Amino acid sequence: MLARAVPTALLALALLAPASAGARPADHLWATVNVCDTAKAPDTLGVRGRMPGNGSHQRMFMRFRAQFYSGSEFRWKYVTKGGTSPWIEVGSARFAFKETGYEFSFDAPAAGTTFMLRGVAEFQWRAKHNHGGKVVTTVARHTRKFTEAGHRTRDADPKGFSAARCELKP
C-alpha cells in the first residue's frame, strides 16, 4: 500500500498556561483520526495528537505513522512508502500541552475493495545538555499512542470528528 504524504498547515496549538496548571498529564496524551475520506479530503487519513508538557525546558516532538489492516495476516502493518511523517517540533514542554496533526493521502482503493487504516503518534521530549564542551540533544522520554475515538480536535473534517480507524472506499 502506497501513501502520498501531504503535510498540512496544522500548526501546533500552544496554550499559555504552564504545564503545572492544567489537567493530569495522562489526559493530554492521545492520538485520534480527525479526517477520514471526506469530500474535502478524499482518500485521506488525518491523524492528530496531543502531548503534555512537563514544565521543563525540553522541546516536544511528534511523528505520525499510518497503518493498514492486513486481512490475510490478521494484523496491523505499517504503510511502507509515504506512511511516515517527518518529526514535527511542536514547542516547549513548559506549556500544559501541545497539539499538531498530519494528513496522509492514498491512491483510491480498487472497485470492490476497501482500506482499513489507523494512525500511530510517536512522542518525544528532547533535552539539550553540555557534553564535553558541546551541546548535544538527547531524547529524555518517548512513547506512542494508537488512534482512538473521543477527542475533539481543531481542523477535524467533518467538524467534531474523532475516530480510532478510517475506512477508505472506492
Language model regions located:
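Positively charged n-region of N-terminal signal peptides that target proteins for export
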Residues: 1-5
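Solvent-exposed serine/threonine-rich low-complexity stretches and specific carbohydrate-binding patches
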Residues: 76-97
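Proline/serine/threonine-rich low-complexity linkers at boundaries of modular beta-sandwich domains
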Residues: 22-28
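Bacterial N-terminal signal peptides
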Residues: 7-18
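Contiguous beta-strand segments within globular domains
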Residues: 37-51, 59
